UniProtKB/Swiss-Prot annotation:
Major site of localization recorded for this protein: membrane
InterPro entries tied to this protein: AAA+_ATPase (IPR003593), ATP-synt_VA_C (IPR055190), ATP_synth_F1_bsu (IPR005722), ATPase_a/bsu_AS (IPR020003), ATPase_alpha/beta_chains (IPR050053), ATPase_F1/V1/A1_a/bsu_N (IPR004100), ATPase_F1/V1/A1_a/bsu_N_sf (IPR036121), ATPase_F1/V1/A1_a/bsu_nucl-bd (IPR000194)
Protein name: ATP synthase subunit beta
Record field: catalytic activity: ATP + H2O + 4 H(+)(in) = ADP + phosphate + 5 H(+)(out)
Residues covered by region (Disordered): 476-509
Key words, A-Z: ATP synthesis, ATP-binding, Cell membrane, CF(1), Hydrogen ion transport, Ion transport, Membrane, Nucleotide-binding, Translocase, Transport
GO CC terms: plasma membrane; proton-transporting ATP synthase complex
């Protein structure tokens, strides 16, 4: 039996072409006249390489004319030669959906990686789908409470919205995504889908182990197309994960959390594919279709009536340049942005969120309420004034400031440190359990802090703690130690002349 005959039995189609050119992951295939497959159709080629037989999946990317199609391979093309038969499946790439995908790891083609052969009999959906119709969208806006003080107070997340974590290399994007998976799964239940797009394979394995240890793997589906995969796979893996999430939203009427790490790699893979297809590059070398490709993905991530897909996306910022077309294009689709800053990270404040650079569309009295909005704006005002004064402090010293500004600087430094928090995802590194602070307590604590109710407490007491009880406990501990050494019973005060001194004290604490 020939390979073409076997493929005909598998796919039910006799539309068979042959390979005429192979250039890396780009494959040109010639079909009989009048039988050219449609764009995005999946093609299969049976190849043998070093005594190993495998099925190669290609996706039609261009029609070249004269019955020729140009395809992108989803796997390495080692062993693929001219003349090999290629069969049109008559459909696009599809992935398994349903309750059975939870607790397992899949690749972009829907093959189970942790249990080969698992899921072959599941219902399958095409990864290329249209977004919900406008009249099906959910008109209400609701906040998603996370238990992280800096997020809930200053950049509240939208249930059913799109949230991005911006930052350069090594500032904690993946750790924060792992933290959110833990928090959402433990506090709210529901289903999570994780898409690993072009990131480190080691991180994918670590995530798998951590989710299993936290007992949340049973409610999570993972789809990986990591950095060792061809660009075609890295470009499609986000769509595969989104398709699984859409099933839970549309068929099971569930609220779903979709995590994408990293959306920049999706753009990067699209750029590689565009170059391989011979398209003229656009700004900074990116593909001319960047906005369309991003829109096709982001428009499907939305809330329909009574159910939602809430997406959290890590966005790598090349060279910390926010004007780069990749992060700039992502901005247009977002409901909330959380910027992770290297300067905040260097102070040892985790999560390293820059509160002045982060934003949310629902930080509005009509959504979060008057009290939440008022407290958030006062905290932002204090932090912004502190930032404005830092040049003067660096040149002249804090003693040259007016008394009012001195007091504001002291208060701002306490606010900065109180925005830090121990995280569940980092327990194995810090040895400290993660903390969750209810929104009401967060608002109350920062209201008191911004009014000066805690000005007498040492700065170190605010560092890497949870709510008000933790603050009182740590302040009493530090106060007792400092009284014993000073002997005069004076309230504990910290030296604020230098940021570096305060930061060193925080780290020691």
């Amino acid at each position: 039996m020939t390979a073409a005959t076997e493929q005909k039995e598998k796919t039910g189609t006799d539309n068979v072409g042959r390979v005429v050119r192979v250039t890396g992951p780009v494959v040109d295939v010639e079909f009989p006249r009048g039988s050219v497959p449609e764009l995005f159709n999946a093609l299969h080629a049976e190849i043998s390489y070093k005594d190993l037989a495998k099925t190669l999946t290609l996706e039609v990317a261009q029609h070249l004319g004269d019955s020729l199609v140009r395809c992108i391979s989803m796997q390495p093309t080692d062993g693929l030669v001219r003349g090999v038969d290629v069969t049109d499946t008559g459909a696009s790439i599809s992935v398994p959906v349903g309750e059975g995908v939870k607790g397992h790891v899949f690749n972009a083609l829907g093959a189970c990686l942790d249990d080969p052969g698992y899921g072959k009999d599941f219902e399958k959906w095409s990864i290329h789908r249209k977004p919900p119709a406008f009249d099906e969208l959910e008109p209400r806006t609701e906040m998603l409470e996370t238990g992280l003080k800096v997020v809930d107070l200053l950049t509240p997340y939208v249930r059913g919205g799109k949230i991005a974590l911006f930052g350069g290399a090594g500032v904690g994007k993946t750790v924060l995504i792992q933290e959110m998976i833990n928090r959402i799964a433990r506090n709210f239940g529901g289903t999570s889908v994780f898409a690993g797009v072009g990131e480190r394979t080691r991180e994918g394995n670590d995530l798998w182990v951590e989710l299993a240890d936290a007992n949340v793997l049973k409610d999570t589906a993972l789809v990986f197309g990591q950095m060792d995969e061809p660009p075609g796979t890295r470009m499609r893996v986000a769509l595969s994960a989104l398709t699984m999430a859409e099933y839970f939203r549309d068929e099971k009427q569930q609220d779903v959390l979709l995590f994408i790490d990293n959306i920049f790699r999706f753009t990067q893979a699209g750029s590689e594919v565009s170059t391989l297809l011979g398209r003229m590059p656009s700004a900074v070398g990116y593909q001319p279709t960047l906005a369309d490709e991003m829109g096709e993905l982001q428009e499907r991530i939305t809330s329909t009536r009574g159910r939602s897909i809430t997406s959290m996306q890590a966005v790598y910022v090349p060279a910390d340049d926010y004007t780069d077309p990749a992060p700039a294009t992502t901005f247009a689709h977002l409901d909330a942005t959380t910027e992770l800053s290297r300067s905040v990270f260097s102070k040892g404040i985790f999560p390293a969120v820059d509160p002045l650079a982060s934003s949310s569309t629902i930080l509005d009295p009509s959504v979060v309420g008057d009290e939440h909005y008022r407290v958030a704006q006062e905290v932002i005002r204090i932090l912004q004034r502190y930032k404005d004064l830092q040049d003067i402090i660096a040149i002249l010293g804090i003693d040259e400031l007016a008394e009012e500004d001195k007091q504001l600087v002291q208060r701002a430094r306490r606010i900065e440190r109180f925005l830090s928090q121990n995280m569940m995802a980092a327990e194995q590194f810090t040895g400290q359990p993660g903390s969750t602070v209810p929104l009401k307590e967060t608002i109350e604590a920062f209201d008191k802090l911004s009014k000066g109710d805690f000005d007498h407490l040492p700065e170190q007491a605010f560092f890497l703690i949870g709510g008000l009880e933790d603050l009182q406990r740590k302040a009493e501990s530090l106060g007792a130690k400092m009284e014993d050494t000073s002997g005069d019973g004076a309230p504990a005060q910290s030296d604020s002349k230098s940021d570096s001194k305060g930061d060193d004290a925080d780290k020691d604490a």
